[in-house]
Amino acid sequence: MLSPRRTKFRKHHRGRMKGLAARGNQISFGDFALRALEPAWITSRQIESGRRAMTRYAKRGGKIWIRIFPDKPVTMRPAETRMGSGKGSPEYWVAVVKPGKILYEMKGVSETVARAAMRIASYKMPIKTQFITRIETKAPIVE
C-alpha cells in the first residue's frame, strides 16, 4: 500500500474539499482514464485494490499509472477513551480527491479492455467515477 516515506508533520487537520480539481484533471500519460465525479478521501487500501483489479483484468497487458497519492494521515483515538488528552495516533493514509481529478490512466490496451478494467476498479472506489479517453478530456464533469 502507498504511504509517504517521511513527512514534515505527523498529524494533519481534516480540511475541506471545496470546488473542482485545479490540477491533475487532464490525461497526461495514457490514452484512457478514470475521473472522479465526487469529492472524497480515498484510502491507500482502496487505491491498491483498484490497481490490482485493473492489472488482473488486463492480464499484465498495457501500462497503468496511479495519478493520486495518499499523503494525508488520518488519526484515530483508541476505542472507549475519555474525551481530551490530545489527538489520536495516525492510523492510515488518504488521498484528498476533488471532482475532476484523474485517478488512474491506462495505455497499451484496447478501449473495450480499458473500459472493462476501469469499471471493475470503479466498484472499489467510494465515489462515482467516469471513464474518459484522451479525446474527451475536456468533456464536462457530469454525473
Curated annotation (Swiss-Prot):
Q: Which GO terms describe its cellular component?
A: chloroplast; mitochondrial large ribosomal subunit
Read off the SUPFAM superfamilies from this record. Answer: Ribosomal protein L16p/L10e
Per the record, the GO terms for biological process are: mitochondrial translation
Q: Where found in the cell?
A: Plastid, Chloroplast
- What's the chief localization of this chain? plastid
Q: Which InterPro entries match?
A: Ribosomal_uL16, Ribosomal_uL16_bact-type, Ribosomal_uL16_CS, Ribosomal_uL16_dom, Ribosomal_uL16_sf
Decide whether keyword Chloroplast is in the record: yes
The Gene Ontology terms for molecular function here are: rRNA binding; structural constituent of ribosome
Keywords per UniProt: Chloroplast, Plastid, Ribonucleoprotein, Ribosomal protein
Q: Supply the HAMAP family for this chain.
A: Ribosomal_uL16
Assembly mode: Part of the 50S ribosomal subunit.
Q: Which family does it belong to?
A: Belongs to the universal ribosomal protein uL16 family.
Q: Which PANTHER family match?
A: 50S/60S RIBOSOMAL PROTEIN L16, LARGE RIBOSOMAL SUBUNIT PROTEIN UL16M
Q: What is this protein called?
A: Large ribosomal subunit protein uL16c
Q: What organism is the protein native to?
A: Chlorokybus atmophyticus (Soil alga)
Q: Which gene encodes it?
A: rpl16
